[in-house]
């Protein structure tokens, strides 16, 4: 039986997570993409805590209007997570694409974070 897109993504995710982990000095920047929003969070895998998180949903609530899931708004999420990281004195991160192909909105989050000063 053929694997669905999501099942393939979950298998890729497991392979990636075997190799990628974050710590306090260099946390993992995890990106999740749903049909309506994109989410990004910084995770310290040694303690199992989320250090910072943001999404198009959270940014939309701050602005008072709903943000649609576009490449431009994904870039805004990247810039916002970089700003939150800078507030916590985090300069370097490990990027976890969460099984998604590094293209489009996922790439836009990474590029936005790099523009705002995060090192991958």
From Swiss-Prot:
- Its domain of life reads Bacteria
The cross-references to NCBIfam families, in alphabetical order and at most eight, read:
L18_bact
- Alphabetically, which GO biological process terms does the record hold? translation
Q: What is the protein's known function?
A: This is one of the proteins that bind and probably mediate the attachment of the 5S RNA into the large ribosomal subunit, where it forms part of the central protuberance.
Q: Which HAMAP family does the UniProt entry name for this protein?
A: Ribosomal_uL18_B
Keywords assigned by UniProt, alphabetized: Ribonucleoprotein, Ribosomal protein, RNA-binding, rRNA-binding
Give the residues annotated as coiled coil: none
Q: GO terms for CC?
A: cytosolic large ribosomal subunit
Q: Which organism is it from?
A: Oleidesulfovibrio alaskensis (strain ATCC BAA-1058 / DSM 17464 / G20) (Desulfovibrio alaskensis)
Which family, according to UniProt?
A: Belongs to the universal ribosomal protein uL18 family.
Listed under subunit, the entry gives: Part of the 50S ribosomal subunit; part of the 5S rRNA/L5/L18/L25 subcomplex. Contacts the 5S and 23S rRNAs.
| GO terms assigned for molecular function | 5S rRNA binding; structural constituent of ribosome
- What's the protein name? Large ribosomal subunit protein uL18
């Amino acid at each position: 039986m053929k694997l669905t897109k999501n099942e393939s993504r979950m298998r890729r995710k497991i392979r990636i997570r075997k190799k990628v982990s974050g710590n306090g000095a260099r946390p993992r920047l995890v990106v999740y993409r749903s049909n309506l929003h994109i989410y990004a969070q910084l995770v310290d895998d040694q303690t199992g805590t989320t250090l910072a998180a943001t999404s198009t949903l959270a940014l939309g609530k701050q602005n008072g209007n709903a943000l649609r899931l576009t490449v431009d708004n994904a870039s805004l999420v990247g810039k916002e997570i970089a700003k939150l990281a800078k507030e916590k004195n985090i300069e370097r991160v490990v990027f976890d694409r969460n099984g998604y192909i590094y293209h489009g909105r996922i790439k836009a989050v990474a590029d936005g974070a790099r523009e705002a000063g995060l090192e991958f």
